[in-house]
Regions:
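Noncatalytic, solvent-exposed loop/strand surfaces
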Residues: 26-226
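Bacterial N-terminal signal peptides
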Residues: 13-23
Length: 226
């Protein structure tokens, strides 16, 4: 497990250092503020992709074990990690790589997860004012950019063979989260599989759609406007 933690920690270093110029948004471009960037597409039309070298190294910062992707505000980088069984939300200064703050989620039993996964896999969503984080072991937490907790919403831990991976999404005033249980897992309640939409300002549930026959899923929703 120690080797596994070190491997995930190192992968963060590479992402932050050598992928940094790709993720820096140009003025007026769509922000890289969610899983896979603008609307989850994985595409930045104005990005210039080159082969990184040691000369491109700006800074490096050791980080805890985890698999979430970094998301960017104007001057900060946000991601999650796990340290000493604590679920962490982490903010770094974009220019220097300095860790600005770490916030622990409320103490909870850590969900079961596959050795190649982690309980800190979902990627946060950040907008101009707030940061939204989902941990399968706990639920949703909203912070401001300075790390002040705005609200939290405990949710039942999804049951699956591999752990949780679905990331939160913001659309207008809604925070959307997919929560899927595996109907074929022992003690699993298939009726708990659902999509939630919460008021992003308060964490109050606005609507939910049940998926009673859906097995485990790890996808993150995207918005289709038509």
């Amino acid at each position: 497990l120690k080797k596994q933690k070190m491997r995930h920690c190192s992968s963060y270093h590479v992402l932050l250092l050598f992928g940094f110029s790709f993720f820096l948004p140009a003025q007026g471009s769509d922000p890289w503020n969610q899983f896979r960037g603008p609307n989850g597409s994985g595409i930045r039309a104005d990005a210039s992709i080159g082969v990184p070298s040691v000369d491109d190294l700006l800074w490096k910062t050791p980080l805890p074990f985890g698999l979430s992707c970094p998301v960017l505000s104007e001057d900060k980088i946000f991601l999650t990690g796990m340290e000493n069984k604590s679920l962490l939300t982490i903010a770094l200064d974009k220019e220097s790589g300095k860790i600005l703050w770490k916030k622990k989620a409320p103490k909870t039993e850590i969900e079961k997860f596959h050795p190649s996964s982690s309980p800190v896999t979902p990627t946060p969503f950040v907008d101009g004012k707030r940061l939204y984080v989902y941990f399968g072991s706990y639920g949703l937490i909203c912070y401001d950019h300075q790390g002040l907790e705005i609200w939290k919403k405990p949710l039942p831990t999804p049951r699956s063979l591999y752990g949780t991976a679905s990331s939160p999404l913001v659309y207008k005033n809604l925070l959307i989260q997919v929560i899927d249980d595996d109907a074929h897992m022992p003690n699993s309640q298939v009726s708990r599989s659902r999509i939630l939409a919460l008021d992003k300002e308060s964490g109050e549930i606005i609507w939910e759609r049940f998926r009673p026959f859906h097995r485990s899923g790890w996808s993150t929703p995207t918005i289709w406007e038509h």
